[in-house]
C-alpha cells in the first residue's frame, strides 16, 4: 500500500511539474540557467543510473560514444529531464529481453544524443504529430503504458530553448529519438556567474522516480 501511494504521488507530481513547465514556456517565463556542461558525462551518468530499473524488466541498456570529453552550453537540470523522458518512453515500448542504446556523437557544429530501442516502434500515422500535446501511441481504453501525453511536447520545448531540435529517425525496427544541440560554449565570465546562480537540484534517483512513475503494467 505504501509503495502504491508513493508511486501515485510521483505520478501526480510529474503531471503537475509538466503542466507548470508548459505554462511557463507558453507565457515566456521558463528561464534556463546555461553553463558549460560536460554533456558526455551527463548523458552517461543518467544512462548508468537506470540500469537497475531496466534490468528488473529484463531490458538491456548500453551507452556508447567515441567522445571522451565535451563541454557545451546547456542547462543540466532541463537536459536531465529530456533524457529521462526519452528513456522512459523507450522502456515503456520495449518488450522483455529488448535492447535500448544511448549514443552521443558530435561534429564541429552539433552534438547528437540518440536514444534507440528495438521495441514496438511508432506507427506512421502519428509520427508527424508525436511531439504535439496529448498525442499518445497507445490510445486503447485498457492501455498498459500510461502517460499524460505532454512529455514529448515538453521535451521538444526544452530542447528548442537550447536552440536545438529533437526528431524521430526513420528506422525499420523500434524507434530512435535524436536530440540535436549546438556545439558551442559560453564565455567563462557568464559560465562562472551562472554556476553561482544554479540552485541545488533534486537527487537523480528522485528525478528517475518521478519520470518513470507512469511505467507500470495493468492486469
What annotation goes with each model-predicted range?
Residues 90-91:
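Short helix-loop "hinge" at the ATP-lid/N-box region of the Bergerat-fold HATPase_c
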Residues 59, 163-164:
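Conserved glycine-rich
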Residues 33-38, 55, 60-70:
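Conserved catalytic submotifs in the C-terminal HATPase_c
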Residues 122-136:
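Short conserved segment of the HATPase_c
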Residues 7-12:
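Short alpha-helical segment of the dimerization/phosphotransfer core of two-component systems
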Residues 44-56:
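Short alpha-helical segment within the cytosolic histidine kinase core of two-component systems
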Residues 23-34:
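Helix-loop junction within the histidine kinase core
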Amino acid at each position: 500500500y505504501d509503495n502504491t501511494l508513493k508511486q501515485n504521488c510521483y505520478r501526480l507530481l510529474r503531471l503537475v511539474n509538466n503542466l507548470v513547465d508548459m505554462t511557463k514556456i507558453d507565457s515566456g517565463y521558463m528561464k534556463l540557467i546555461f553553463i558549460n556542461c560536460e554533456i558526455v558525462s551527463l548523458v552517461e551518468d543518467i544512462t548508468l543510473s537506470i540500469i537497475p530499473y531496466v534490468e528488473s524488466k529484463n531490458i538491456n541498456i548500453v551507452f556508447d560514444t567515441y567522445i571522451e570529453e565535451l563541454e557545451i552550453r546547456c542547462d543540466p537540470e532541463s537536459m536531465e529531464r529530456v533524457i529521462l523522458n526519452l528513456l522512459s518512453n523507450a522502456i515503456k515500448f520495449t518488450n522483455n529481453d529488448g535492447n535500448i542504446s544511448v549514443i552521443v556523437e558530435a561534429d564541429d557544429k552539433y552534438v547528437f544524443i540518440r536514444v534507440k530501442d528495438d521495441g514496438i516502434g511508432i506507427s506512421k500515422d502519428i509520427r508527424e504529430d508525436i511531439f504535439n500535446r496529448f498525442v499518445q501511441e497507445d490510445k486503447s481504453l485498457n492501455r498498459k503504458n500510461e502517460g499524460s501525453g505532454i512529455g514529448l511536447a515538453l521535451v521538444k520545448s526544452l530542447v528548442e530553448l537550447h536552440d536545438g531540435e529533437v526528431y524521430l529517425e526513420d528506422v525499420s525496427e523500434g524507434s530512435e529519438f535524436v536530440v540535436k544541440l549546438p556545439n558551442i560554449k559560453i564565455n567563462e565570465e557568464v559560465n562562472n556567474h551562472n554556476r553561482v546562480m544554479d540552485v541545488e537540484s533534486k537527487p537523480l534517483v528522485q528525478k528517475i522516480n518521478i519520470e518513470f512513475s507512469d511505467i507500470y503494467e495493468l492486469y
